[in-house]
Amino acid sequence: MPIFKEYTDFDAVGIAELIKSKKIQPIDALDTAIELIEKLDPTLNFMHQKTYHFAMESLNRNKELNGPFAGVPMLMKDMDSALYSVPMMQGSNYLKNIPMKFNNSLSKKFTNSGALICGKSATPEFGLMITTEPTAFKPTRNPWDTERSTGGSSGGAGSAVASRAVPIAHASDGGGSIRIPAAACGTVGLKPTRGRISFSPSHGDKWGGLTHSGILSRTVRDTAFMYNELFSQEIGDPYSVHYDKGTLINALDKNKKYKIGFNTDTRIPVSISDEAKNAVRFNAKICEDLGHEVEEVKIEYDGLLLSRAFVIIISSHVSQMFNELKDLVGRTYKKREVENASRMFDYLGKSFRGSDYTWARYTIQKISREVMQQTNDYDAVIMPIISQSAPLLGELRPKKSAELINDIVMTLRLGSLFRNHSIRDKLLNKLAPDSLWFAPDALLQNVTGQPSISMPTYYTDKDMPLGVQIAARYADEETLIDLASQIEKASPWINKKPNVS
């Protein structure tokens, strides 16, 4: 039996309150988390590295239990989370056994909050897939059905939080990677506004401003309290988004009435399942019953154009990432060390010209403006984040046709063909639906930079969670926390536990 047997009944704020009131000792929570990790991880594979020593050292240094999350166990994602002397493997054999030489800004903020970092959670290689099935590690499994995916790229965090091994975990989101695992695993996942959380000291932004750091949690209040600690800029950051301390905590009890739109469609040429549409309508009905003004809204944009621009930006940054990693590792990667899809992104990025990248940036900025103008009359918009409940493991891995194209292009060195816009567009038009079918509109708020939250309010006939996303205006997480808190009280999920927990 766990040392603190009620551990899984409490969220992170609840555990912190028990520790502060001396009803439990911080070592009790840490030992219980370690026991649960050791019990659950062999089945779920949500861990890439264990850092129990790091957690214990933090606890020994923080004898006064400073910070709102003092003594609360958590995980850091194995990306965007530099811990001194701990490798950041990013799901790749290429980076195994390469210790980091610094603590980044985000890991310092988590440590300053008092949270105890017990390990590095699983991620697909370099965060490039929306399923957490890297070839360097065992696939991460969904605790609701272990034959199914957790989504990605923060799938390890989603599985760990949903299974209640830890109440809170770091996540990051470059195209849905906070909200997709939240929706698939049944957790709360809020992607913040662009620029809220610094990537200092190593980067100004990631993926041209598309990537955002954040967390997964089990409750809205955990999200509000932790982001209250994380929201701040560092000197030299490329974006500045002011935050008044305490705003999100105060928003938990505002209970304002809002004008809310809902949309069940997508402009990416893929299908949204009936169950995903039902999930949107279910959440819209909750909002209507709460007294909010709710109406359907159509959002028009060129989905294929957006997906092409998205791939160009990502692949360009992946190529630059490999340049940086070469300096870190001391050599170029070997073919067997890096997955085919990752090498394809690298090769694509090297084939694009500066004008291609500029076109892609202008394109997403244009579409961002169009989307924000169409939705600006609404305080929040509800839309699908995933097109169905979690698919079986393997279904979100690259299709064989895509793998074959990868091999041909890289073997014959045909990357220059992508400089021909006609050939490039035809190929990307074919590949985009294959890569985006599970989460077609996940990237929309990465493009606009707006905050967006997913919550586990809806469950399918097979008792699988199927979250939706609710987006707000730029820099308005306050509205999302208020609305999400209202929805959580009207349709609570805290007592729903997955099969493996």
Summary of predicted features, one role per range:
Residues 417-418, 480-501:
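Short, gly/Ser/Thr-rich active-site loops of penicillin-recognizing serine hydrolases
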Residues 23-31, 60, 274-298, 326-330, ...:
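Acyltransferase
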Residues 191-284, 301, 491-501:
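A short helix-breaking turn/cap at a secondary-structure junction
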Residues 55-57, 62-136:
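Acidic/His- and Gly-rich active-site-bordering loop/insert found
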Residues 1-57, 285, 289-290, 462, ...:
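An N-terminal boundary/leader segment
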